[in-house]
């Protein structure tokens, strides 16, 4: 059995590096003071401290939060705004990373700007680029990404549809931040900058542009008789003339209605919307439909009158045919003209529908 001092020394060696940093040890190298991440099992890149005091990489916490808003070790709930306002262990390290160690750095495209890769991913990209590789794989927030160094795009290995541009540029170009962490600490900016993807791309400005849609596009264009499209906002100069003509046609007698019945339905439909009030450019669809419905009622009343007149003429024609058939059977020759027309009109109004033949 080991001595008590040996057990203590063994347990200290098994502690994470961040706990070794609290101990005063002369043979500990400065590089070992960087905490280790329990998610990616590597040294932390931009370490953040959760409310439960557990330390992880910022991107590792971000990827794990998609599965559940809880700590990966103790399962304590993570606040909703933690990714917007993370608690960095060393904010100076973020500023130093943005300045870089060399002349060039690697960036990926975001909305309204470029994000700089974290130091570890930048080293992997630079190493693959210097060796002339066509592509390389990167582990970001628990997802495997493929960097296409020929087309300068990145995408998830299991989802090729979502692509993002990447580039190799000088270190001093304007940038939004590093690995999803903004360089500016303005509270208003941070609240609006909710990052939605693992590689730190934001999607706030997309909602403001997509919500604005023109109202005029929802108005249906009018179709004229010759098949051309006319816009309600640009009426023809003869609109007032066609308005007077349409009402004049509606007030004609039965003969005029009979002539109207030979016209096509397309002409009636064309007169209804054009005979309404001339709409302004900002006229809504409801106003256009109400004007069209008022004219359609006038046209429908004329159609009903024409329908009743047609039925009366059909009854007269059937009665005339019945009289001529019976006159042939009795052997009496009659002419259709003369009193036949008068007798037919009387017989057609009888309720029983029977006709009696009176010889003259």
Curated annotation (Swiss-Prot):
Reaction(s) catalysed (UniProt annotation): S-ubiquitinyl-[E2 ubiquitin-conjugating enzyme]-L-cysteine + [acceptor protein]-L-lysine = [E2 ubiquitin-conjugating enzyme]-L-cysteine + N(6)-ubiquitinyl-[acceptor protein]-L-lysine
Biased composition (Polar residues): 307-333
Domain WWE: 92-168
Pfam families with a match to the protein in the record: WWE (PF02825), zf-C3HC4_3 (PF13920)
EC number, as in UniProt: 2.3.2.27
Residues recorded with modification Phosphoserine: 290, 294
A cellular component annotation (GO) from this entry: plasma membrane
Keywords: Cytoplasm, Isopeptide bond, Metal-binding, Nucleus, Phosphoprotein, Transferase, Ubl conjugation, Ubl conjugation pathway, Wnt signaling pathway, Zinc, Zinc-finger
GO molecular function, one term: ubiquitin-protein transferase activity
InterPro entries: RING-HC_RNF146, RNF146, WWE-dom_subgr, WWE_dom, WWE_dom_sf, Znf_RING, Znf_RING/FYVE/PHD, Znf_RING_CS
Chain positions covered by the region annotation Disordered: 259-360
Biological processes, Gene Ontology terms: positive regulation of canonical Wnt signaling pathway; protein autoubiquitination; protein K48-linked ubiquitination; ubiquitin-dependent protein catabolic process; Wnt signaling pathway
Paired cysteines (S-S): none
Pathway this chain belongs to: Protein modification; protein ubiquitination
UniProt biased composition (Low complexity): 295-305
Function: E3 ubiquitin-protein ligase that specifically binds poly-ADP-ribosylated (PARsylated) proteins and mediates their ubiquitination and subsequent degradation. May regulate many important biological processes, such as cell survival and DNA damage response. Acts as an activator of the Wnt signaling pathway by mediating the ubiquitination of PARsylated AXIN1 and AXIN2, 2 key components of the beta-catenin destruction complex. Acts in cooperation with tankyrase proteins (TNKS and TNKS2), which mediate PARsylation of target proteins AXIN1, AXIN2, BLZF1, CASC3, TNKS and TNKS2.
Subunit structure of this chain's protein: Can form homooligomers. Interacts with PARsylated AXIN1, AXIN2, BLZF1, CASC3, H1-2, IPO7, LIG3, NCL, PARP1, XRCC1, XRCC5 and XRCC6. Interacts with DDB1, DHX15, IQGAP1, LRPPRC, PARP2, PRKDC, RUVBL2, TNKS1 and TNKS2. Binding often leads to interactor ubiquitination, in the presence of the appropriate E1 and E2 enzymes, and proteasomal degradation.
Name of the protein: E3 ubiquitin-protein ligase RNF146
């Amino acid at each position: 059995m080991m001595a008590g001092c040996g057990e203590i020394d063994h347990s200290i060696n098994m502690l994470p590096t961040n706990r070794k940093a609290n101990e005063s040890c002369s043979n500990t190298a400065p590089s070992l003071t960087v905490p280790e991440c329990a998610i990616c099992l590597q040294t932390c890149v931009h370490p953040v401290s959760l409310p439960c005091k557990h330390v992880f990489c910022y991107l590792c916490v971000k990827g794990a939060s998609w599965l559940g808003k809880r700590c990966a070790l103790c399962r304590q709930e993570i606040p909703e705004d933690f990714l917007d306002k993370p608690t960095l262990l060393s904010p100076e390290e973020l500023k130093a990373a943005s300045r870089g160690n060399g002349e060039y750095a690697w960036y990926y495209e975001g909305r309204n700007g470029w994000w700089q890769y974290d130091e570890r991913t930048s080293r992997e990209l630079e190493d693959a680029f210097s060796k002339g590789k066509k592509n390389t794989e990167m582990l970001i927030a628990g997802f495997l990404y493929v960097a296409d160094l020929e087309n300068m795009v990145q995408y998830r290995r299991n989802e090729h549809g979502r692509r993002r541009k990447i580039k190799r540029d000088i270190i001093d170009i304007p940038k939004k931040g590093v690995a999803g962490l903004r360089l500016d600490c303005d509270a208003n900016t941070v609240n609006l900058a909710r990052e939605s993807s693992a590689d730190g791309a934001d999607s706030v400005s997309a909602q403001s542009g997509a919500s604005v849609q023109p109202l005029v596009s929802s108005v249906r264009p009018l179709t004229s008789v010759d098949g051309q499209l006319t816009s309600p906002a640009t009426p023809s100069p003869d609109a007032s003339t066609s308005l007077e003509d349409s009402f004049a046609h509606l007030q004609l007698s039965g003969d005029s209605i009979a002539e109207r019945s030979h016209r096509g339905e397309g002409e009636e439909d064309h007169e209804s919307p054009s005979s309404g009030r001339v709409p302004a450019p900002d006229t809504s669809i409801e106003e256009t439909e109400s004007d069209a419905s008022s004219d359609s009622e006038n046209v429908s009343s004329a159609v009903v009158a024409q329908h009743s007149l047609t039925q009366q003429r059909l009854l007269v024609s059937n009665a005339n045919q019945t009289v001529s058939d019976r006159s042939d059977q009795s052997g009496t020759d009659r002419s259709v003209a003369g009193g036949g027309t008068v007798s037919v009109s009387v017989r057609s109004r009888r309720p029983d529908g029977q006709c009696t033949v009176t010889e003259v």
